[in-house]
């Protein structure tokens, strides 16, 4: 930690009157630079990083998730990375439980937690809380899966739209797991998933003094360029070999949450002979762009975000140092 930031750290960490413990939420679209800023905050402030990423929880999925490298993790450890095998499920409720425990652990050490990632549903559930919607029923799930094999997931998505249009509007017609879960909840309870979510509880928004920062480019075209460049870099780094190792295990399939992760689904189809290499690349980039679009939709409705742009008003790229200084300056204002 730089000595010049010690005073800032002391102000951020020290209790002051009725002020709640500080927690930093660092969000943004994919490929925007969240990891770099999180590592910088660790170096500058001694903050502890908690990953908020539904794909990085899986072991042996490193390149395609843009997981921090071994050297980066040695420099700035990330919690909630590599905690599940790709064959295992990891729910939103699992994340909320684990993240709450990590935040408490970090505060007990007198440090500041930085929750960094792009899985917006995780952030929303952690801050606003989870509802007590019914647990999964294997028999009901099996019935839905049987119908899907006969009718196709788009048909079941249309059915979901007829009973719960709000939930269906936020789910892609081919996102089997989410369609299945939403229909399952409706069949079991007779109540829409959107109605259950309206009864959320146990959120942390009022438990901590949240500093909520979004790092993003001013222009979407820059993000699209970075997405394409990063996907090509992943391919050069051996992404296909990484997915091939998962494919050859024979205990994973394309309907599992791990393999549905952006990029992995497209590479899986390539290895299965469903698409060509060029088609895989195009679809992988397109899927990542769609992910960024969905993330921006969440972010635009997020109240209380401090936007830190990676470009100036003339669309020129800012240096890493300039971006970090923007974040530190905003944090300093919060202590006044």
UniProtKB/Swiss-Prot annotation:
Keywords: ATP-binding, Magnesium, Nucleotide-binding, Transferase, tRNA processing. Substrate binds at residues 30-35. One of its GO terms (molecular function) is ATP binding. ATP binds at residues 28-35. Residues 53-56 are annotated as: Interaction with substrate tRNA. The keyword ATP-binding applies. The record marks 119, 141 as: Interaction with substrate tRNA. The keyword Nucleotide-binding applies. InterPro entries: Dimethylallyltransferase, IPT, P-loop_NTPase. Disulfide bonds: none annotated. Its EC number is 2.5.1.75. GO terms for biological process: tRNA modification. It catalyses: adenosine(37) in tRNA + dimethylallyl diphosphate = N(6)-dimethylallyladenosine(37) in tRNA + diphosphate. Belongs to the IPP transferase family. Catalyzes the transfer of a dimethylallyl group onto the adenine at position 37 in tRNAs that read codons beginning with uridine, leading to the formation of N6-(dimethylallyl)adenosine (i(6)A). This is tRNA dimethylallyltransferase. It comes from Saccharophagus degradans (strain 2-40 / ATCC 43961 / DSM 17024). The gene is miaA.
